[in-house]
């Protein structure tokens, strides 16, 4: 049977048997009074554009984290060698210094790329015509089979474990996060990081800055764990405890790299949300959730905030099933 295009994303996951969610005032599902459909073509084009932007952001976070983590590793190694005064270590010390210099150069290159990305987003708001051309020039018939299968697996994973991922995103303490991942090690994967990153965009579009910062913290945590596993050439599920050990000890280099990447990521999310493409949408212009990154219409914002209707449906933006409202202040602690 033919699958719909684009495939459903985490913002439109169907509830399985017996699973219920309290109706939220942000509910824009077809059964809601706020629902007002628009032509499928426009929704698909816009969803595709948002997905491209979010994917670009995820790749940037991944590369930036890799650079910062490798630099922290090299600095720690250099520091440990400095404690020894043996001449036999001179050669290794020189190699470590060279590695630090190279990594600092790479870090500077990524800093320049980040500045270029920020400048481009400030000067180039969403171009619907460009999105349209990209969509209609792309062949959906001859897609690479492996890529399609990977996307299907990713969507299936996020659909199956959506509630668990959201729960992890709301945790605010290192010990709580480590304990939760110990109980649910299958969540230590790229799909969890992707879901949390996309959630950050939606929360910032809703002007829920404090909650966005909490979810951003957990998104960067997951990305750092994945990078550590890559560097150690081990399964991420087997090394996440090492990350929390370093984080709780606030080891020099590692913790600083984490904080810097977290602040940089939050700044990029805010910048994206300020563009028309990630603005909250009016009820009249709201589009059905046809893709992972669909946030809504690219129409200019009205001046009256009462007329705005934010896009994420109740299953995503309603967190009362995970944490009670009176715990909001506690949840905002990021350490």
Curated annotation (Swiss-Prot):
InterPro entries in the cross-refs: Cdc37 (IPR004918), Cdc37_Hsp90-bd (IPR013874), Cdc37_Hsp90-bd_sf (IPR038189)
Region (Disordered): 1-42
Compositional bias per record (Low complexity), positions renumbered to this chain: 27-40
Region (Self-association): 2-170
Gene3D superfamilies reported for this sequence: Cdc37, Hsp90 binding domain (1.20.58.610)
Official protein name in the record: Hsp90 co-chaperone Cdc37-like 1
Region span, Self-association and interaction with Hsp90: 147-276
Subunit structure: Self-associates. Forms complexes with Hsp70 and Hsp90. Interacts with CDC37, FKBP4, PPID and STIP1.
Protein function: Co-chaperone that binds to numerous proteins and promotes their interaction with Hsp70 and Hsp90.
Region entry Required for interaction with STIP1, spans: 277-335
One GO CC term, this protein: cytoplasm
Compositional bias segments (type: Pro residues): 1-11
Family per similarity comment: Belongs to the CDC37 family.
Pfam annotation, one family: CDC37_M
Signal peptide: none
Chain coiled-coil ranges: 84-120
Organism per entry: Rattus norvegicus
Domain of life: Eukaryota
GO biological process terms held by the UniProt record: protein folding; protein stabilization
Residues annotated with Phosphoserine modification: 32, 88
Residue span of region Interaction with Hsp70: 266-335
């Amino acid at each position: 049977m033919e699958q719909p295009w684009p495939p459903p994303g985490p913002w439109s996951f169907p509830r399985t048997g017996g699973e219920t969610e309290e109706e939220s005032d942000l509910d824009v599902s077809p059964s809601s009074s706020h629902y007002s459909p628009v032509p499928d073509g426009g929704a698909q084009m816009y969803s595709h554009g948002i997905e491209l932007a979010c994917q670009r952001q995820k790749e940037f976070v991944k590369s930036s984290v890799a650079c910062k983590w490798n630099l922290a590793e090299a600095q720690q190694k250099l520091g440990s060698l400095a404690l020894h005064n043996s001449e036999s270590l001179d050669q290794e010390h020189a190699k470590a210094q060279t590695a630090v210099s190279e990594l600092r150069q790479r870090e500077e290159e990524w800093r320049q790329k980040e500045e270029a990305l920020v400048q481009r987003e400030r000067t180039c708001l969403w171009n619907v015509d460009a999105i349209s051309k990209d969509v209609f020039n792309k062949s959906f018939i001859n897609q690479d089979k492996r890529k399609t299968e990977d996307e299907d697996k990713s969507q299936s994973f996020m659909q199956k474990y959506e509630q668990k991922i959201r729960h992890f995103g709301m945790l605010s303490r290192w010990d709580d996060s480590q304990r939760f991942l110990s109980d649910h090690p299958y969540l230590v994967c790229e799909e969890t990081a992707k879901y949390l990153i996309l959630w950050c965009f939606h929360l910032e579009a809703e002007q829920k800055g404090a909650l966005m910062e909490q979810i951003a913290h957990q998104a960067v945590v997951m990305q750092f764990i994945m990078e550590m596993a890559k560097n150690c050439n081990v399964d991420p599920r087997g090394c996440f405890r090492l990350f929390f050990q370093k984080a709780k000890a606030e080891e020099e280099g590692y913790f600083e790299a984490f904080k810097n990447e977290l602040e940089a990521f939050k700044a990029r999310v805010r910048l994206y949300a300020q563009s028309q493409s990630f603005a909250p949408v009016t009820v009249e212009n709201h589009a059905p959730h046809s893709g992972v990154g669909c946030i809504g219409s690219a129409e200019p914002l009205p001046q009256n905030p009462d007329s705005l209707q934010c896009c994420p449906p109740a299953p995503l933006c309603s967190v009362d099933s995970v944490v009670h409202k009176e715990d909001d202040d506690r949840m905002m602690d990021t350490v």
